[in-house]
Each structure stands twice: as C-alpha cells, then as structure tokens.
Amino acid sequence: MWNRAAAAACLALAACRAQPSEPQFPAAHRDVAPTVSDTFSTEDARDRVGEAEQVMELAGVKPGMSVADVGAGEGYYTVRLARVVGPRGRVLAEDIVPEVRDELSDRVQRERLDNVAVKLGTADNPMLPTTSFDRLFLVHMYHEVQSPYAFLWHLRDGVKPDGLIVVVEANRPVKQHGMPANVLRCEFAALGMQPVKAAMLSSGENYLKAFRIAAPRPSPDKIQTC
C-alpha cells in the first residue's frame, strides 16, 4: 500500500515538474501609470463629447462583427459596441478586477445584452480566445499595463488575420495617465504589429491608432524593447 502511494506521489510530482513554466518577458523601459477608478467619467458627459461614436466609426465597427473590449471597466464602450454589432455580432468584455467583472456582468444581465459575454483576465494576459475578433479595443487603459510586452504577446493571439487592434489614449506623459504616440507605436512594433490608421479625436488631446499584425510573433527572449 505504501509503495502504491509513494509511486502515485512521485508521478504527481513529476507531472508538476514537467509543466512548462511561464515565459519570461522583458520589462518596460518607461513609466507605468497606477490603476485608477474604473469610473472614467459620467456616461452622460462622455456621450456629450461623442468619443465612442467617433471611435467606432473610425474603427469600422459594423453589424455582425465580433469585438472585444479589453479593460472594459463599468462597460461604457461594451454597451455601445453591443448596439452597433447587433444581435448577429458578439462582444467580449474583459477586466482584471473580479469585483468590476461581477458588476459588469450584473449590468449586462440587467440591460439584457444577449450578445455580450464577460470574462476575467490577468494583468499581463487578457485570456482571449484565439483568432476570434474583428476588432480589439484598448480604450484609455494601455498606460496602466505593467508588463506591456507580455500583455501584447498574449493579446495579439485574439485578433483575426484581417482584424484590427484599436487603441485610444491621451497624448500626454504616462504619469499623467496618457501614452505618447511614439512609445505606443514602438511597443506594438516590437510584437510585430504596425499602425494602419491614426486620427486625433474631437475631444482634443485624445488620439486613436489602429494596428494590424504585420509579422510573426517573436519569442519572448527575442523581443526588441523600446
């Protein structure tokens, strides 16, 4: 009996040791903004600025598309994307804070958004299904990503071959909760993604950049940092 138990323990230990370790990614050579409240502004105030409508139009969001709202927070973009893609489309809303995810799930159920799913990711991996989305949206959140190379390495798996990753940021220093456009472009280029659209938004200092996968994903130890 002891021999069987010992053998089972050895097999379990060997299996644990055989599991591949998480790859090691280079650190960001820039500031990272602290995470702030997911309440960016009142929704009425944001609607008055009209940013969401402008962003969705520039990004080419259409009925029937599959889109992801990464770092969805309270779901401001989530619910508006759901309306545009319609019943034939799908929206995945992701956040890394369990309480925020739960509150967003409640909102989705309360507003009967049948085309929206909500999931929990991690700080460096949004856990997106592979090659599933026509558009991935990162809205006013990329400056808070602590491990951008790991995050982008995992993120790009979720976009379809002809899909776009759409970033909205403020053109100001990271410590002021913005992202200089040249830094954004460099970090995306390090993961094989190139910009195909850029625009300043009507709100003034905010900009949009849309990226497409242009090269194979490098292994973590081959990433050329900015």
Per-range role (PLM):
Residues 13-15:
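C-terminal motif of bacterial Sec signal peptides marking the signal peptidase cleavage site
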Residues 17-68, 76, 106:
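Class I SAM-dependent transferase core
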Residues 134-148:
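A short SAM/SAH-binding and catalytic strip from SAM-dependent methyltransferases
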Residues 200-226:
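Core SAM-dependent methyltransferase catalytic element
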